[in-house]
């Protein structure tokens, strides 16, 4: 507690800021310097104990010193400094340090308690209206001072918004506090949050926010604005706001019938209106927005909104001062502001009688001097105190009407909303039977709501629609789903499904009688022209939850009409562009989820949501869904990780997509849309139907559903959203230009035991689900059990039990679902049970039955598998490696391991390559050798692909062997899946290079690939369904991915494999062609654009982790200009590599070992196979010292000398790298590989030359246009390589002993780095390939 010793000095510093003189607070002349000192100490305080701010809290300096200074300071610099200090003091505790760590100690818990107390006292201090008034007025002053805001002034506005955000974010520890100042002796409890919100809205924070959303500098505070709006709606349920809107419309209908008789005079036009009230045709269905038949553009409306807001900012400031003066003279009973009513019609008799009864009602004429559709509203009020509480009782039964004559009917909602529209601050809640919250003199400008009630498809819990930031104790309640009052909570009514053969679920009906629609639209017009709104004028009125809900109901309408589309657009653009400054995406998801349902309910014109209902937004939501699914699963694997943020974001993504799709359905039924709007909706649906990632996303999310961490509400939202998407896909196929979608094939991905089990979990609670949710479940089960004839996946206890309960309870469901239940139960009872199958442990390559049986007979325990690698290292020096490993197992008391099972286990643990496996197996198993002999070796494989006469065109190529093996095992569909992904990456890369926008491109770009390419991130190979997931467990396919240069999940420590983002379109197109023919695939681009492109001079294909160059050679195209590069002296190359090893530590861009997670394997980045400039120079010098080979004997002697020199240098380098460079790299072989990798280019093989490419004729040796002739020697890996010469197989006599010693030393070095064993073993195989090719070369030359 040493920091308390500084408290007297601290109190002296704060007391020097100012003092009260005769009841007036006088600011000290040195206040600015003192504030700067305080801010400096706050910035550099103890980062753990936070002693300085704790001392401030202990001394109550926020309430005693800073708030009075904020309220009375006139100097802008002082105000700026005070606000900056208050922002710093109100930062949440969790942003200061790790709360979990601090809770573990007594000192930490005490620190947290004191900081929370400081925050609570700060929030309590801001319940004074003067404190928030000072902040709001300061922002208005900045905006009025200069239309062109400087960056410094923008920072000042952002600090004000941050302060309001921090204050509203502070939790109320005691939930409520007493306000004896407002209610003496009553003891009525009032929420601090409600009080602050009430004060802010009276001080016209709503108008200010709407202006800031549309000003040119909105990008500087867009994120803060979203956070502030989210906190304003905290703990507000969507269902509550929807009910208020619907109740208001229902109450308005009862008032319209009386007006229809006598209201015949058309309303007068406001001075700022630019269009008449009536269209040329009252029943016109056009979308004219009242601008002389010309639809304003987005920028025009935005500019007009800013101009209209600027015109009223001075008025807002003036009214604010009037409000503050009225607070000082609160002894007056009430104030009535008189003024001309030129834009108003006379009141009705009923209204006049009601007005006479309301002695505390204040009204003010509407300021209509602004352009139509550009008027904002204010809520500047002069408080008035009444002496009679009876007024409250009387005003609760009053009804309000704006003016007597209704406007003639217009069918275009856009014209209704644009004609002299200005958002509401607050509509009298008395007609809803609630207390009107406002007190005092108000300037209120009208707003509109759409009369039609929107039916929501799901019936869910009341806690499902909390505003952003609500924390519920029950995890099942944490959701943002739709309403709980739009579906039956008890027994659903009997309802027949539609007759559609594909989707027979209940269709939502929006049918409203036409006369009811007309009455509602008349009421909207009447409200749009209304200028007098009667409000209860009690300064002592304390707001409750209902008052705040009514207040936010009106702000919701204003926000949707004036700022929603701008704010979403701004946040979306920042999420795509601000890669360096991460933004919490949950704000964006919440904006779409929370407000889009209101836009559909009000049937707002499309121009108000033109930036939300776009394919760009839906594409981003799809990409985020995949990304969050991977992040959630990764964090779920980490013990003790906090999954709540990921669960929250994941749920918000699903609900945002649901609201997006529901809005499309709702607007498809709106009758007053223009042709342009309908065309945009059709195009959006066609884009959705063409997007594979979106529909596959729900297959992925349902498969990855985890009942232990996910809530049932999340599962329900998944099922409902997927159902809505299927309906849209079905309808999109019927549109003009729609593509035929294989829905049956898509639905078959859901026909798994796993997914149907989750449907059964949701069906268990059928009595509480609601009719629509049950329809979604039964529809999917009907398709799977009926159309797909896979009723077997429904034979699960949880599903059958639910069926039995529904059947026994005589639950009233439609006939089709009853038939489904009866069919499944009958089929299950009459299906004979099958004997349990013994699932064999198949070998990785599934080649012969004998191998499988032998492998099954030799089970491997975890201890055996762990010992295998060590035994392999020990036995590497032996001639019979496999026999020695079997002997070691037998000597250590283990069961006898067969030789074949040891070889298979070596391959399974990635200790040997597939080609090494082939070499070992063909000497162990005669049948396996016969299978290899049957492999086609001609220039045309069994797949019909013509292979070029090059290194990678030979069947012995690693990639070609894997491709042949995958095709032989009837797994070609996996290659097609990879081909499609590579072609999509190629297409997106080409479009991004052309600068095309995602919306403008036809055909569309898949969301996941597009956003990864746009953000320059590797593209994930997402396994959408079970079949693709099993593919990633298939060892040959995984080896193929690695050979192609695709980063495996284990290499990156992620769930999905990754395609490098730096690959060029030519590279990706070449890989796709290598995997198989492209004739049957639909290409989105013209392949001639890539084939005619200039060849790349650098290699961007496969990585050097499994082979020195890998099977993907750099395609140099016209390589006649490249001369042959002779071999370099290994000693010289070794010295050059050693000299550059230290400064080039980051050559592989790998993190150091101490920063690596033990579960992550790392693979070095691809490096070009072309020698570096130093290698070129050294090899050129060597070529001058050596005479060129003139005949076969010279070539043989030269190659033999080079091979012997390299073998000796390799052995010495392996030891040097282990002792000197092991600490700098994850494995010593990485450095060793950097030194050893050299490329020798020779002529290609021909009729007169051997397969090695060295002993060719003079003509073949003089051909420089085939640089890949000897590169195949760098890829082939084997212990004892068979050289293919025609159809005859030759076996080398023996293996060099020096080489064996080298391999053993390398394995010993790798075993010391256990986390990277697989990478080290892969690199060692490159040396095997390199050395064996040189021995093969010598052998063939001798023969």
UniProtKB/Swiss-Prot annotation:
Compositionally biased region (Low complexity): 273-288, 489-498, 1249-1262
Keyword Signal applies: no
Extent of motif Nuclear localization signal: 517-527
The record's account of how the chain is modified after translation: Phosphorylated with a circadian rhythmicity.
GO molecular function, one term: DNA binding
Region (Disordered): 256-314, 453-512, 1247-1270
Biased amino acid composition, Polar residues: 471-482
Cellular component terms (Gene Ontology): perinuclear region of cytoplasm; replication fork protection complex
Protein's cellular compartments: Nucleus; Cytoplasm, Perinuclear region
Record keywords: Biological rhythms, Cytoplasm, Nucleus, Phosphoprotein, Repeat
UniProt subunit comment: Forms a heterodimer with period (PER); the complex then translocates into the nucleus.
Similarity comment text for this entry: Belongs to the timeless family.
Annotated function: Required for the production of circadian rhythms. The biological cycle depends on the rhythmic formation and nuclear localization of the TIM-PER complex. Light induces the degradation of TIM, which promotes elimination of PER. Nuclear activity of the heterodimer coordinatively regulates PER and TIM transcription through a negative feedback loop. Behaves as a negative element in circadian transcriptional loop. Does not appear to bind DNA, suggesting indirect transcriptional inhibition.
Protein name, entry field: Protein timeless
Organism: Drosophila virilis
Gene: tim
């Amino acid at each position: 507690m040493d920091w308390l010793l500084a408290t007297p000095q601290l109190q002296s510093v704060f007391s020097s800021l100012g003092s009260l003189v005769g009841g007036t607070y006088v600011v000290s002349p040195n206040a600015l310097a003192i504030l700067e000192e305080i801010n400096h100490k706050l910035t550099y305080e103890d980062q753990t104990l936070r002693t300085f701010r704790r001392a401030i809290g202990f001394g109550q300096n926020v309430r005693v010193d800073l708030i009075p200074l904020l309220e009375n300071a006139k100097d802008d610099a002082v105000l700026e400094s005070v606000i900056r200090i208050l922002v710093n003091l109100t930062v949440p505790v969790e942003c200061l340090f790790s709360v979990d760590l601090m809770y573990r100690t007594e000192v930490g818990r005490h620190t947290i308690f004191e900081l929370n107390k400081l925050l609570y006292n700060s929030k309590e201090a801001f319940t004074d209206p003067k404190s928030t008034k000072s902040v709001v007025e300061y922002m208005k002053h900045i905006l009025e001072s200069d239309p062109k805001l400087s960056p410094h002034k923008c920072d000042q506005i952002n600090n004000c918004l941050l302060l309001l955000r921090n204050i509203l974010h502070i939790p109320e520890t005691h939930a409520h506090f007493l306000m004896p100042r407002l209610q003496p002796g009553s003891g009525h409890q009032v929420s601090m949050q409600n009080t602050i919100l009430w004060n802010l809205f009276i001080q016209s924070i709503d108008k200010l926010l709407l202006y800031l959303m549309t000003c040119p500098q909105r990008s500087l505070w867009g994120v803060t604005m979203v956070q502030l709006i989210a906190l304003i709606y905290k703990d507000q349920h969507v269902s509550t706001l929807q009910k208020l809107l619907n109740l208001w419309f229902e109450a308005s209908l009862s008032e319209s019938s009386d007006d229809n008789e006598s209201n015949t005079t058309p309303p007068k036009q406001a001075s700022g209106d630019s269009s008449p009230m009536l269209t040329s045709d009252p029943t016109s269905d056009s979308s004219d927005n009242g601008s002389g038949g010309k639809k304003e553009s987005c920028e025009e409306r935005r500019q007009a909104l800013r101009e209209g807001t600027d015109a009223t900012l001075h008025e807002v400031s003036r009214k604010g001062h009037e409000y503050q003066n009225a607070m000082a003279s609160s002894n007056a009973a009430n104030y009535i502001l008189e003024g001309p009513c030129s834009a108003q019609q006379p009141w009705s008799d009923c209204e006049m009688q009601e007005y006479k009864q309301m002695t505390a009602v204040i009204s003010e004429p509407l300021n209509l001097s602004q352009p139509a559709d550009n008027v904002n509203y204010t809520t500047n009020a002069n408080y008035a105190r009444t002496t009679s509480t009876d007024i409250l009782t009387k005003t609760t039964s009053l009804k309000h009407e704006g003016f007597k004559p209704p406007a003639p009917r217009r069918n275009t909602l856009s014209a209704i909303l644009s004609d002299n529209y200005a958002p509401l601050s607050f509509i009298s809640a008395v007609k809803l039977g609630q207390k009107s919250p406002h007190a005092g003199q108000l300037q209120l400008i009208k707003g509109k709501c759409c009369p039609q009630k929107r039916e929501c498809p799901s019936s869910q819990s009341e806690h499902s629609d909390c505003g952003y930031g609500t924390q519920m104790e029950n995890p099942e309640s944490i959701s943002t789903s739709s309403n709980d009052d739009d579906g039956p909570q008890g027994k659903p009514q009997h309802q027949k499904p539609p007759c559609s053969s594909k989707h027979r679920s209940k269709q939502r009906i929006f049918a409203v009688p036409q006369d009811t629609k007309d009455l509602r639209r008349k009421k909207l017009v009447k409200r749009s022209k209304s200028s007098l709104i009667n409000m209860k004028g009690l300064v002592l009125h304390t707001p409750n939850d209902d008052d705040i809900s009514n207040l936010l109901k009106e702000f919701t309408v204003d926000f949707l009409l004036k700022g929603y589309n701008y704010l979403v657009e701004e946040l979306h653009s920042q999420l795509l562009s601000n890669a360096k400054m991460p933004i919490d995406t949950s704000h964006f998801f919440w904006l779409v989820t929370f407000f889009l349902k209101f836009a559909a309910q009000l049937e707002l014109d499309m121009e108000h949501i033109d930036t939300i209902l776009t394919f760009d937004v839906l594409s981003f939501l799809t990409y985020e869904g995949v990304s969050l699914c991977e992040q959630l699963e990764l964090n779920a694997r980490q013990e003790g990780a906090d999954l709540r943020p990921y669960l929250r974001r994941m749920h918000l993504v699903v609900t945002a997509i649901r609201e997006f799709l529901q809005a499309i359905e709702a607007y498809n039924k709106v009758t007053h849309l223009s042709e342009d709007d309908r065309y945009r909706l059709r195009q959006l649906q066609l884009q959705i139907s063409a997007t594979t990632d979106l529909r596959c996303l729900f297959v992925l999310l349902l498969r990855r559903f985890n009942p232990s961490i996910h809530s049932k509400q999340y599962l329900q939202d998944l099922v409902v959203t997927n159902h809505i998407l299927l309906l849209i896909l079905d309808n999109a196929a019927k549109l003009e230009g729609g593509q035929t979608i294989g829905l049956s094939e898509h639905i078959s991905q859901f026909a798994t035991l796993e997914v149907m089990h989750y449907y059964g979990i949701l069906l268990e609670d059928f009595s509480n689900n609601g009719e629509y949710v049950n329809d979604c479940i039964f529809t999917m089960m009907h398709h799977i059990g009926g159309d797909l004839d896979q009723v077997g996946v429904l034979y699960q206890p949880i599903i059958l039990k639910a069926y039995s309960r529904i059947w026994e309870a005589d639950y009233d469901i439609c006939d089709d679902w009853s038939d489904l239940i009866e069919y499944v139960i009958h089929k299950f009872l009459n299906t004979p049970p099958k004997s349990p199958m013994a699932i064999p442990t198949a070998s990785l390559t599934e080649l012969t039955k004998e191998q499988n049986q032998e492998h099954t007979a030799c089970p491997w325990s975890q201890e055996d598998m762990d010992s295998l690698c060590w035994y392999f290292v020990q036995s590497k020096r032996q001639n019979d490696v496999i026999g020695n490993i079997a002997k070691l197992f037998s000597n250590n008391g283990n069961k006898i391991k067969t030789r074949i099972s040891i070889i298979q286990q070596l391959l399974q643990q990635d200790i040997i390559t597939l080609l090494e496996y082939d070499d070992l197996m063909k000497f162990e198993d005669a049948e396996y050798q016969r299978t290899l002999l049957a492999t086609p070796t001609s220039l045309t494989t069994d797949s019909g692909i013509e292979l070029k006469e090059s290194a990678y065109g030979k069947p012995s190529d690693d990639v070609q062997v894997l491709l042949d093996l995958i095709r032989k095992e009837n797994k070609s569909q996996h290659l097609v899946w990879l081909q499609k992904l590579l072609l999509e990456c190629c297409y997106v890369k080409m479009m991004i290079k052309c600068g095309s926008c995602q919306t403008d491109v036809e055909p569309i770009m898949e969301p996941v690939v597009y956003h990864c390419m746009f953000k320059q991130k590797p593209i994930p190979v997402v396994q959408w369904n079970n079949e693709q997931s099993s593919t990633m467990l298939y060892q040959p396919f995984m080896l193929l991915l690695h050979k192609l240069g695709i980063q495996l999940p284990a290499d990156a420590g992620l769930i999905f494999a990754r395609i490098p983002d730096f690959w060029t379109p030519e590279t990706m197109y070449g890989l796709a062609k290598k995997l198989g023919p492209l004739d049957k695939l639909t290409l989105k681009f013209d392949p001639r654009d890539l084939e005619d492109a200039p060849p790349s001079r650098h290699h961007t294909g496969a990585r050097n982790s499994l082979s020195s160059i890998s099977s993907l050679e750099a395609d140099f195209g016209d390589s006649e200009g490249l001369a042959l590069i002779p071999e370099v002296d290994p000693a010289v190359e070794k010295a050059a590599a050693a000299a550059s090893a230290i400064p080039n530590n980051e050559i592989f861009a790998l993190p150091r070992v101490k920063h690596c997670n033990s579960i992550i394997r790392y693979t070095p980045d691809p490096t070009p196979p072309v020698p570096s400039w130093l290698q070129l120079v050294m090899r050129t010098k060597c070529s001058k010292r050596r005479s060129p080979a003139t005949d076969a004997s010279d070539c043989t002697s030269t190659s033999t000398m080079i091979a012997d020199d390299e073998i000796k240098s390799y052995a010495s380098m392996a030891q040097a790298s282990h002792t000197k460079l092991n600490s700098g790299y994850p494995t010593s072989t990485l450095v060793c590989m950097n030194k050893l990798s050299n490329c020798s280019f020779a002529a290609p093989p021909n009729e007169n030359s051997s397969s090695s490419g060295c002993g060719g004729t003079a003509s073949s040796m003089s051909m420089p246009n085939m640089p890949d002739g000897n590169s195949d020697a760098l890829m082939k890996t084997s212990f004892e390589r068979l050289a293919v010469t025609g159809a005859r197989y030759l076996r080398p006599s023996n293996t060099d002993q020096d080489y064996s010693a080298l391999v053993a030393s390398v394995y010993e070095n790798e075993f010391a780095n256990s986390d990277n064993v697989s990478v080290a073993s892969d690199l060692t195989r490159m040396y095997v390939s390199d050395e064996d090719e040189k021995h093969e070369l010598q052998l063939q030359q001798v023969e």
